């Protein structure tokens, strides 16, 4: 049960210009994660899936934007982003990761 929960923690890598620069310069991977997880869950999931050692994890909630089309106003969902700082000597290739 616990292993199944850890496999559902990471939704996808967050690919942006800022995240690719952080990966190149500071060895930081940026992930979209499920809203209810803690730093410890993210740590266990990343260590288990990628076989790396983690130095630090920063987590933040990204608020959904309001989007409208003519007279209809809607909102995008809130989501959680995790910045995972890896120890020296460890790398993760997120671009060639299979779903």
Curated annotation (Swiss-Prot):
Membership in a protein family: Belongs to the universal ribosomal protein uL23 family.
GO cellular component terms, A-Z: ribonucleoprotein complex; ribosome
Natural source organism: Blochmanniella floridana
GO terms of biological process kind: translation
HAMAP family linked to this entry: Ribosomal_uL23_B
Keyword rRNA-binding recorded: yes
InterPro entries, sorted: Nucleotide-bd_a/b_plait_sf, Ribosomal_uL23-like, Ribosomal_uL23/eL15/eS24_sf
Name of this chain's protein: Large ribosomal subunit protein uL23
Database matches in Gene3D superfamilies: 3.30.70.330
Function: One of the early assembly proteins it binds 23S rRNA. One of the proteins that surrounds the polypeptide exit tunnel on the outside of the ribosome. Forms the main docking site for trigger factor binding to the ribosome.
Subunit structure, interactors included: Part of the 50S ribosomal subunit. Contacts protein L29, and trigger factor when it is bound to the ribosome.
Keyword tags: Ribonucleoprotein, Ribosomal protein, RNA-binding, rRNA-binding
Entries under Pfam families matching the protein: Ribosomal_L23
SUPFAM superfamilies, per database record: Ribosomal proteins S24e, L23 and L15e
One Gene Ontology term of the molecular function aspect: rRNA binding
């Amino acid at each position: 049960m616990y292993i199944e929960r850890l496999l559902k923690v990471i939704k996808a890598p967050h690919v942006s210009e800022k995240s690719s620069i952080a990966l190149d310069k500071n060895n930081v991977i940026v992930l979209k994660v499920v809203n209810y997880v803690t730093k410890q869950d993210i740590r266990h999931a990343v260590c288990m899936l990628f076989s790396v050692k983690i130095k630090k994890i920063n987590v933040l909630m990204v608020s959904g934007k309001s989007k409208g089309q003519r007279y209809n106003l809607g909102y995008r969902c809130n989501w959680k982003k995790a910045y995972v700082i890896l120890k020296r000597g460890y790398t993760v290739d997120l671009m060639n990761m299979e779903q």
